[in-house]
């Protein structure tokens, strides 16, 4: 099977700097190049990498652990009367920057959370996944997310049929 691209550009040529007027596609993955990389985007990338070089990754990881531990503690405190089960490791050293809980009605609960601006993720059959980006997630955001989960469970607004409809993206 030969893959082809509908968009061809001069960098997809076998020898782009020969400036041959007849297009001869490269035989490697290079044939999928469309044109010159955007110089401005590379400048932005370089600037962002300069910022990243100044970051203390240990401090970022520590904040990640604090955010996820706070979320677990708040959810277990606020929602103790609901059938939520922590699926992620309790030990923050054993998990990344995400926390998963299971609930038999995970899909509509996550859809209700998303409708209330708490953006999480659902994984079949019953997982509610929450990601925490330590560079910009605030402790207040964690408290608000846990509070909204409690509100949705308490009011049972997740039972509204609008949240039951299947979607391609969770």
Q: What are the residue ranges of the model-derived segments?
A:
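Conserved small-domain helix->loop->beta segment predominantly found in fold-type I
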Residues: 28-35, 52-102
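Short, flexible turn/loop "capping" segments at secondary-structure junctions
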Residues: 41, 91-93, 122-126
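Active-site C-terminal subdomain of aminotransferase-like
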Residues: 1-63, 69, 160, 170
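PLP-dependent enzyme catalytic core of the Aspartate aminotransferase-like
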Residues: 107, 112-170
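Active-site proximal loops enriched in glycine and acidic residues that flank catalytic Cys/His/Asp
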Residues: 49, 88-90, 103, 124, ...
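Hydrophobic residues within well-ordered, non-membrane alpha-helices that form the packing/core
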Residues: 49-52, 75, 149, 153
């Amino acid at each position: 099977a030969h893959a082809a691209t509908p968009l061809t550009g001069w960098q997809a040529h076998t020898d782009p700097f020969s400036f041959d007027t007849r297009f001869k596609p490269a035989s490697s993955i290079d044939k999928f190049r469309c044109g010159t990389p955007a110089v401005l985007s590379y400048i932005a990338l370089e600037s962002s990498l300069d910022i990243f070089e100044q970051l203390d990754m240990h401090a970022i990881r520590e904040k990640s652990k604090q955010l996820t531990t706070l979320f677990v503690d708040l959810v277990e405190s606020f929602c103790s009367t609901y059938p939520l089960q922590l699926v992620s490791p309790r030990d923050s050293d054993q998990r990344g920057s995400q926390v998963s809980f299971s609930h038999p009605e995970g899909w509509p609960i996550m859809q209700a959370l998303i409708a209330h601006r708490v953006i999480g993720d659902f994984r079949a059959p019953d997982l509610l996944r929450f990601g925490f980006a330590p560079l910009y997630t605030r402790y207040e955001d964690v408290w608000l997310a846990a509070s909204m989960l409690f509100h949705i469970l308490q009011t049972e607004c997740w039972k509204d049929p609008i949240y039951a409809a299947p979607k391609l993206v969770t």
